A protein has these predicted regions:
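Short, low-complexity disordered leader/linker segments with a strong preference
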Residues: 1-34, 265
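Extracytoplasmic small-molecule ligand-binding "clamshell" domains
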Residues: 26-97, 167, 231, 251
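Bilobed "Venus flytrap"/periplasmic-binding protein-like clamshell domains
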Residues: 36, 40-44, 53-63, 98, ...
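A ligand-binding cleft/hinge motif common to bilobed small-molecule-binding domains
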Residues: 81-84, 96-106, 150-153, 177-213
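Extended ligand-binding regions for polar small-molecule ligands
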Residues: 22, 58-67, 125-128, 132-146, ...
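Periplasmic-binding protein-like
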Residues: 40-41, 115-122, 190, 194-237, ...
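Acidic, polar ligand-binding/catalytic clefts
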Residues: 62, 66, 71-133, 205-210
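Ligand-binding clefts/hinges and TM-proximal coupling segments of bilobed small-molecule sensing domains
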Residues: 18-26, 146-168, 205-206, 237-265
């Protein structure tokens, strides 16, 4: 009987200790300073899965914050409103597949941590073979994206001859416009567009050229959090060197050479 009582007592003690340890970890995590991170629904970088945020940027941010001693708090933003959310203090930084190129003086940057390509996609049987063939055609892009900025600013000569740019709120709508034949081509981030085109093997084709290659960074308000940005840059570099970033990219099916090191021209 005594042995039974002792076993029960030890079991209860173990449960109490385990609960105490769990509570301690929970308390320690909550005591960490928060880093409020603004993202945008943009698979495979930032999206919702079973009511939780996930994606490449989310995993990179979570690991970087763990190493730096911060607790990440993710907030979903519209692409068009992300700059406003940062400037008014709603978020501490933008970690949302954000292109650094052309914006170097607009923010305090951490990174670059990845590279990206903006590409042209057409139906497999389309006669379009180059950007020049888009003259007089209809092209879909996402509102607030780098692709839309390039179109509005007239930076790419071939795009100046496009007849109509159809601008949609989400990348899913950009793709559906092409699938339903409303437009002749779509332009966007290669990694994000593949989420859609790979659902229909052999039906879509990427033109053998890039619209633009650019660097991705984490944006803080201009002139603020410079030490934090520098620390984050160092942490992201360490994650590249120890293979963490490559492992995350492979998990989401992206080419490591292209996305981590910029590929080749």
């Amino acid at each position: 009987m005594k042995k039974g009582i002792i076993c029960v007592a030890l079991s209860i003690l173990n449960i109490v200790l385990l609960c105490a340890c769990g509570a301690g970890r929970f308390s320690a995590e909550n005591s960490l300073p928060e880093l409020v991170i603004g993202g945008a629904e943009y698979a495979p970088y930032f999206y919702t899965d079973t009511d939780e945020y996930t994606g490449i940027d989310v995993e990179l941010a979570t690991e970087a914050c763990r190493r730096m001693g911060y607790r990440p708090v993710f907030v979903s933003l519209d692409l068009e409103n992300r700059a406003k959310a940062l400037s008014n203090g709603s978020v501490d930084c933008l970690w949302t597949c954000l292109t650094m190129d052309g914006r170097e003086d607009e923010y305090t940057w951490a990174g670059p941590y990845l590279y990206t390509r903006r590409v042209y996609v057409v139906p497999q049987d389309s006669a379009i073979q180059s950007a020049e063939d888009l003259a007089g055609k209809k092209v879909s892009v996402q509102a607030g994206s780098t692709s839309e900025e390039l179109m509005l600013e007239g930076q790419v000569e071939a795009l100046n001859k496009v007849d109509t740019f159809a601008v949609y709120q989400s990348l899913g709508e950009v793709f559906m416009a092409l699938r339903r034949g409303y437009v002749d081509a779509m332009i966007g981030h290669e990694g994000a567009l593949k989420i859609y085109t790979e659902q229909y093997p052999g039906e879509y084709r990427y033109l053998a050229m890039d619209l633009i290659r650019s660097r991705l960074g984490v944006a803080f308000r201009k002139g603020e959090n410079e030490e934090l940005a520098a620390q984050l840059t160092q942490t992201l570099q360490e994650m590249t060197e120890d293979g963490t970033t490559a492992q995350i990219l492979e998990q989401y099916g992206l080419d490591v050479e292209q996305n981590l090191y910029g590929g080749t021209e």
